[in-house]
Each structure stands twice: as structure tokens, then as C-alpha cells.
């Protein structure tokens, strides 16, 4: 099958689309990336997303409208990846659309219940592309008692499981998440969970203090010094003390967190603040390895992916934090995979599994009571 995986993450960089060819289904699937592209959001769309992400500024009218606007954006992005690949849209069998997360509350307080909301109307995508769409991947896992995240472990088992080596896959997107993939000869379980902020705080600080969308290659963070009192404040966040499985998002490490941090430590230089929040991402990752993984698994390789793997300063901080461990650290490109395309490929794989009615959550990662088939299916009109 030819499948387009569509991902719009917490970092709001744009719409990632991976065009892949998948043979078969299940853990024996063969997956080939044909083409990958990122379609940036128009400024007005990005501003509307940022508005609905804010509890203070959001409103139901805007969410309703944006749901359909994003459906059109996602459909346009699918057409773009096909155009760039010289691939006929009519040949496309399936689209897996993650959608844009508006709110995710796996462990809410008060009278709220565990829930999640992604928008980007699948009916609009199906109509515009004349292709079947799989969407809303997180909801069934949450209905089964899971946290709805992380969902990439199933695809990582297919793509990265090694005959003899135990691997850690660390994704560094807006949020960081890790998957432990034991070797094929091991009888240990796959586990996965969010490690805290990835690029989210770094990017927000860059935008506010330097008027830049992100710290390219970590060049600014390389110039500053870590401020111990800021790092201690960050590392005392309650999320780091929780046991896995667990997930997090903009609700805990978004604009409000950054506003409080900058107000509290405004006396420090902006370079030192950026260096310190970069170290926070690295330290939160290393903390979770040493606390929850390395005492129980003998890890041979750590593979870093996602946009954060292009931040050289962040990568070096992670290497330094793991310098006393026996594992070898790679970037995904070192082993022949694209860091940028990882999550889009994952949702293409999950769409293929749903199409074949195969469960594709990993209960040991999400905390769900059972394996379930993920997502909703939206068929195109008959023409």
C-alpha cells in the first residue's frame, strides 16, 4: 500500500508528510520512505493554533473553524508531497492523519476525566484528496485506560528492532519521549514514556528573548553557561518525579511555564537562560534513563531523533550526561533513517495497521488495559 502519514506536532513547525510504501501488516511489515516534506504553516494559521492552545484566549467558534481549516491544510500538504515525489494522488491508498493536538489531559484534576482532542477534520481531507483517511489515533487507547501516548513505539518495533542489541530510541520533538526496544532474542517488554520537554521550552525562549524561531544547531546555547539555580528549579518539576507510563505536553511545559521561569530569573543573561533550558531538556532525558531504564535494561545503543537531534549543543549535553554508561549514542541519520520524518512515518504505519484491523498500541508503554485497534476511518465520497 501507498500511505501518506501526516503529523503536526507540539512545536508548530509545520505539517510533516511522509509518503511511504508498506508491504504487509504487523511486525513483519516492510516500510520504504518514498518522499518526505514539511509544509510550513501560514502565519495566520499558526497564530490561530496558538490562540486555541491557550485556555485564556481560546473559544469554541475558533476551534470549530480551525478544525476545517486544518483539514484543508493537511489535504494540501498531502497533495504537495505527492507533487514533489512525482507520484499520482490517484495511486495513494490511505492517509494517516494525527491532527493538531489542542488539549491532552491523561490525568486531569477535579471533575475532568482522561481525554484528548486533536483537530483537522478528516472528512475534509478525504473529500479533497478522494482518499480514505485514518485519524484520531489516541482516543481508543485512552478509552482502554491508557494515556493515549506515546503511540510511536509500535512503528519503532517494526523499524528499529535489532537481532542482538537492546536499543533506546529518544525522540526530541516539542516533547521528548523514549522507547526501550529489547533485541529480538530478549524476552523483556517494550516500554515507552514521555521524558519531559524536548524543543518546546528552548523554542519558546528563543522566540521571546532572541526573536528567532529556534536555536539553529544550538549555536546560541553553546555561548552561554548553565545557571544552577534555574536548572534546579526546572528539575524539581513534578512530572520528573512521576513513575512511567506517563505523558505530558504544552499544558505543563508551554507558554505558562516559560512565562513563570523568565519572570523569576529575569536578572540572568538571555544566553545563560537559553543554555540552561537546553540543559534542562538534556538532564530530564538522562534523569529518566538512570531512574527508570538503566537499572532494569542493559542498553547497547541510544538513537536520537526528531528536530532536537540537529541541536548539536543539546546532543553533546546528552552525551556528557551518559558518559559513564556503556551505551553508544547515535543520531538516526547515522543508521540510515530520517529524524525529521520519524513521526510522520509512524502514523503512516499506524494507519496501515488500522486498515488491516490490527491493534497497534503498546499497553506497556501507554498503560492501556489491552491492545486495541487505533483510530477512526473516514471514507471518501463515491465518484
Swiss-Prot record:
Q: Which UniProt keywords apply?
A: ATP-binding, Carbohydrate metabolism, Kinase, Nucleotide-binding, Transferase
Tell me the function of this protein: Catalyzes the specific phosphorylation of 1,6-anhydro-N-acetylmuramic acid (anhMurNAc) with the simultaneous cleavage of the 1,6-anhydro ring, generating MurNAc-6-P. Is required for the utilization of anhMurNAc either imported from the medium or derived from its own cell wall murein, and thus plays a role in cell wall recycling.
Give the protein family: Belongs to the anhydro-N-acetylmuramic acid kinase family.
Gene name, per UniProt, is anmK
Write out the GO biological process terms: 1,6-anhydro-N-acetyl-beta-muramic acid catabolic process; amino sugar metabolic process; peptidoglycan turnover
What's one Pfam family here? AnmK
Question: Where does the source fall among the domains of life?
Answer: Bacteria
- Protein known as: Anhydro-N-acetylmuramic acid kinase
GO: which molecular function terms?
Answer: ATP binding; kinase activity; phosphotransferase activity, alcohol group as acceptor
Catalytic activity entry: 1,6-anhydro-N-acetyl-beta-muramate + ATP + H2O = N-acetyl-D-muramate 6-phosphate + ADP + H(+)
Amino acid at each position: 500500500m501507498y500511505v501518506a502519514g501526516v503529523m503536526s506536532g507540539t512545536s508548530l513547525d509545520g505539517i510533516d508528510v511522509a509518503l511511504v510504501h508498506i508491504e504487509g501488516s504487523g511486525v513483519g511489515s516492510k516500510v520504504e520512505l518514498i518522499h518526505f516534506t514539511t509544509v510550513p504553516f501560514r502565519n495566520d494559521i499558526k497564530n490561530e493554533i496558538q490562540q486555541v492552545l491557550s485556555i485564556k484566549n481560546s473559544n469554541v467558534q475558533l476551534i470549530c473553524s480551525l478544525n476545517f481549516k486544518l483539514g484543508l491544510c493537511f489535504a494540501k500538504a498531502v497533495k504537495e508531497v505527492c507533487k514533489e515525489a512525482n507520484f499520482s494522488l490517484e495511486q495513494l491508498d490511505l492517509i494517516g492523519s494525527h491532527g493538531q493536538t489542542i488539549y491532552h489531559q491523561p490525568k486531569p484534576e477535579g471533575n475532568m476525566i482522561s481525554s484528548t482532542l486533536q483537530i483537522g477534520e478528516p472528512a475534509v481531507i478525504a473529500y479533497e484528496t478522494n482518499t480514505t483517511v485514518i485519524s484520531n489515533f489516541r482516543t481508543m487507547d485512552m478509552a482502554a485506560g491508557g494515556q493515549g501516548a506515546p503511540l510511536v513505539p509500535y512503528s519503532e518495533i517494526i523499524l528499529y528492532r535489532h537481532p542482538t542489541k537492546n536499543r533506546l530510541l529518544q525522540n526530541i520533538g516539542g516533547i521528548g519521549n523514549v522507547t526501550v526496544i529489547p533485541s529480538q532474542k530478549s524476552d523483556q517488554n517494550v516500554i515507552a514514556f514521555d521524558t519531559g520537554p524536548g524543543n518546546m521550552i528552548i523554542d519558546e525562549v528563543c522566540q521571546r528573548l532572541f526573536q528567532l524561531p529556534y536555536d539553529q544547531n544550538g549555536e546560541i546555547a553553546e555561548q552561554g553557561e548553565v545557571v544552577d539555580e534555574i536548572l534546579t528549579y526546572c528539575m524539581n518539576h513534578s512530572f520528573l518525579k512521576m513513575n512511567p507510563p506517563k505523558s505530558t505536553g504544552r499544558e505543563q511545559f508551554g507558554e505558562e511555564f516559560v512565562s513563570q521561569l523568565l519572570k523569576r530569573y529575569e536578572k540572568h543573561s538571555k544566553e545563560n537562560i537559553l543554555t540552561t533550558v537546553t540543559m534542562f531538556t538534556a538532564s530530564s532525558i538522562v534523569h529518566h534513563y538512570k531512574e527508570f531504564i538503566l537499572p532494569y535494561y542493559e542498553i547497547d545503543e541510544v538513537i536520537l531523533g526528531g528536530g532536537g537531534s540537529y541541536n548539536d549543543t543539546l546532543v553533546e549535553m546528552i552525551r556528557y550526561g551518559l558518559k559513564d554508561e556503556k551505551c553508544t549514542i547515535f543520531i538516526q541519520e547515522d543508521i540510515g533513517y530520517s529524524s525529521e520524518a520519524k513521526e510522520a512515518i509512524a502514523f503512516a504505519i499506524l494507519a496501515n495497521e488500522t486498515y488491516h484491523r490490527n491493534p497497534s498500541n503498546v499497553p506497556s508503554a501507554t498503560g492501556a488495559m489491552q491492545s486495541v485497534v487505533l483510530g477512526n476511518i473516514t471514507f471518501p465520497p463515491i465518484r
